[in-house]
Amino acid sequence: MENFKTRRSVIQFEDVSFEYPGAETDSIHHISLDVKEGEFLVLTGGSGCGKTTLTRLINGLAEQFYEGTLKGRVTLLGRSISEYPLYEIGKKVGSIFQDPKSQFFASITEDEIAFGCENYGVPYEELDGRVSSAIKRINGDMLRGKEIYPMSSGEKQKIAVASVNAVDPEIYVFDEPSANLDMYSVEALKNLMSALKAEGHTIIVAEHRLYYLTDLADRFLYMENGSIKEKWTAQERLSIPEGKRRAIGIRAADLHHIEVDIPPAKEKNMTMEVKDLTFSYRKHPVFHNISFQAYAGDLIAIVGHNGVGKTTLSNILC
C-alpha cells in the first residue's frame, strides 16, 4: 500500500452527521475521515449502512439535492462543501451511479458524453477532442452514434464513465457500480478504474462486491448503522477470518471458494411453463423461442452477458 500521509487532503469529514427529513435517526453520524490525493477508497457494509449518504456528501447531492440536516464539516479541496454551488462541485467530483440511465440527459452516445462539457462552456473546438478521448478511454468506438436506451447495463456504465471523464474531474465517486454488471463488464469496469487511478485521480467506491477491487483499493472502510466500524488495508481485508466475514456480512474476496447451502426441492409439481417466447424492443430483437419449465421448490438462475435479455425475461415473467 502506498504511503499517502504526505499527500494533500482532498476530502475531509470532521464529526459529520446527516439526517434525512422524517428519519428517526441520522443516516450517518459522527464520521471523521481524511481522503488523500490519488487514494482509492472503498466503502462497504450492508444495505442502509450509510455508504450512499456518505458519497452524496462528497458530491454535494446531500443537502443541495437531497434535503436533510448536516452537522459537522465536510471539506472539499480545502473549502467547505457548503460554500460550493452544486455546478462547481460537478467540475471537481464526477459521479457514476448504480443505475447509469438515471444520470443520462441525451439519447445518443456522443451527445450524452458532450453534455457536461457543453454545460460548462467548453469551447466547441475543444469539445470534439474531449468526446473522442473519452470514447477511446472506454474502448467505445463500437458505441458511437448508438441509442443509449437499448444498450446493455455494461455499455450504459461505460457511457456514464465517459461522460464524467470528458469533464475531467479530479475526484471520481462510484455508487455500487457493479450491481447490474456481468463478470466481463465488471472486469472492464476494473480496467477503467485502474487507468483512472494510474492517472492520479482520487476514487471513492461504495460497493458490496469486493473481489474486483482488492488489487486497486488502498483502504476499505466497513460501515454499520451509519458509522465507520472498521478500516482495513487491502492485505488486512484479505486476512479477515471467514467466520468474521460471514458475521459482518461482507462479500468474499475470492469467488472460487464460495460455499452455498441449497436445500433439495421437496416437491416436483410444475408451477410455470414457458413455450417459444420471443420478444423485441423497438425492432431490436432481445430473445426468441425461449422454452423452459419450473417446478415447486426450484431455484433457477438466469445467467448470461449484459444485454442478452435476462432482465427483460424476468420482467415478462413477473
Give the predicted meaning of each segment:
Residues 161-162:
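Hydrophobic anchor residue at the start of the ABC signature
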Residues 207-208:
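H-loop/switch region of ABC-family ATPase nucleotide-binding domains
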